[in-house]
Structure formats: C-alpha cells, structure tokens
Amino acid sequence: GSGKTTLMRLITGQLRAQQGQVLVEGKDVAAFSAAELYEHRRRMGVLFQHGALFTDLSVFDNVAFPMRELTRLPEAVIRDLVILKLNAVGLRGVEKLMPSELSGGMARRVALARTIALDPEIMLYDEPFTGLDPISLGVIAHLISRINNALRSTSVMVSHDIEQSLAIVNQVIFLAHGEVVFSGSPEEMRQLDSPWVHQFVHGEPNGPVAFRYPAATTLQQDLLG
C-alpha cells in the first residue's frame, strides 16, 4: 500500500501525477500526446505480477501477440522470433501448449518471453517473484538479470523479495507510506541505520510497522463490554 504499483502506472502513463513529474529521457510522461504515449508504451515491456497470459491462446500465439499487434513483420519472421524468445527463457519446444498446461514457473517464463518480444528499451517488473517455488524464483531472477544485460535496457522492478532483488539490482528505492525513505545501492541499504529498512530487510514482526492494529479500545474494555 505504499504506492509501488501506482508508481509503475505513472511511468506507463496510465495515471497522471497530481504533483511532480515522471521524466523519461527528459520528457514528462503526463504531457505526452496520444501518439507520443503510444510510442512510449511501444518501447516498454511489462511483466505483470501473475504473468497475465491469454488463456485462450497457445504459448506461441501469446509470445507472437505484440509482434502481430505492433509490427508489420511477415509471419515467417514472427515464427523465428517467437522460437528465439522462448529459447532465451529456456522453453523452446512448448510453443503448442496452452497456458493451462504450464506450471506456474513456466507460465511466468512464457510471460517474460512475451515481454521481451520487441526488445524493449524499458522493462517494468511488477512483483516478478510472487507465488513461485524456490527453483522457479531463482530461474526468473537469473533471467531478469541476464535479459537486462543482453538488452542493455533500463529496468524498474517492484518486489518484496529482498534477497533476490538486492542480488540483481544496481539501485534501490525504498518506499514507505508513499514516501521515499531510502535511495542508494544495495550495499548502502544493508548498512543503513533506519528502523523502517531494518524491519523490512530482516523480516521483524514489530517495529515502525506495528504487529498490533491500533484498536480504539483496550482488550479489557472489549472483554468487559
């Protein structure tokens, strides 16, 4: 509830900031015309929290979807590109499967292949590790790091997974109650003397985020009526 996903929607232009600016290459996203916003989004790849695959389309058609919608590439070229993208995430050979036939980790990797279909300059990851088993989580973290280096893209990742996130990112922005409480390198974050950051990094049950909800009455008052 600190505004992480909202921030991503500001970057994509789905929301307009009431105050301040979101600048991409020095240009205010909120000031884009419809044509500029279309081109801005065309340069982006977004990996949604649960993959968001089209359930009625095969794996092949899911990955091919942005190519067919946003380019005029011939089908033969699209076929080769789909195979290359699936190979990049280790899933060449599953083209004919439906999303319902995939495990959770495989579905997330197919979604990642679709995300990189057009070699985006900006990558947005919304909770990419949510709901994954340890092996799938490690695979996705490895792929995110490798793809980012291969594409040389700017990547923004929203995540609660401290261990995996700090292992692959260059800069951390820590949000609490809609405000930035820390911005710096992973190493600086680990050494920071901040109650907010310390509780989050170490998973402590009590701290600035209290264990108990601030009830208006005492327990004794509730029990005695």
Region roles according to the model:
Residues 12:
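Helix-to-loop junction immediately C-terminal to a conserved catalytic motif
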Residues 123-126:
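Catalytic Walker B motif of ABC-type/P-loop ATPase nucleotide-binding domains
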Residues 98-102, 106:
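Conserved ABC ATPase signature
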Residues 29-45, 75, 189-192:
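ABC ATPase NBD coupling module
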Residues 119:
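Conserved catalytic motifs of ABC-family nucleotide-binding domains
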Residues 27-28, 75-93:
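Conserved ABC ATPase "signature" region
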